Amino acid sequence: MELPGNIKQAKKAFYGDTALIDGADTTACMQLENMDSMYYGCVALASVQIPDSAKELSNICNGCVNLKEVHIPSAAQKMNSSFFGCTALESITGEIPSSCTDSGNLFSGCKFLSGTLTVSCTSRTTLSSSFSDAATAGTGLTIILRYDAEKSQETANTGFYGGTKSADEILNALKASMEATFSSGSHITITTNADKTEG
């Protein structure tokens, strides 16, 4: 099914469709922003397209146990439980942008996650439960935490870590909060790449 190019929201469009195998064709969707719970519970879903315009992605593929690859859009803002329980998920393309400040349980239970994922961070980024019980099998996942100095300037006075924290302090706090939720069998490595030009 091809979605029209002018569509802006597809919230719960295929919610609970257990027979759906291929997700909708979103090639022409340059304005699609809300995909909240679009494929929630689609247990047979094997492929999905997520355009870079998408912002609202909470629960988009929650429980899609046959999905193996996903793309994270550059405009993402809300990704709470987006791929929760996607037990076959292996590959992630794109990166988690600094605009995303809601990512609780994002990849929880995705035991085969592997490869490298970059997360662009600000003082408002929270990742404490995003990878709980993830990457417990397979070849392992490397997460690169990258400090977004420009975006952090915009949120300096409202950030969860305050406006006086350095890039290293923010990234190290994020790393510690993430590691505290990893299961004992997780094969996840976190590295930080602080931008020393933060000013």
Regions found by a protein language model. Give the residues of each.
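Short, flexible/disordered intra-domain loops and linkers
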Residues: 153-162
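Intrinsically disordered, low-complexity segments enriched in small/polar residues
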Residues: 13, 37-38, 89, 145, ...
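Structural signature of tandem-repeat unit edges
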Residues: 1-8, 18-33, 43-56, 65-77, ...
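Consensus positions within tandem repeat domains that build extended binding/scaffold surfaces
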Residues: 9-15, 34-40, 58-62, 80-84, ...
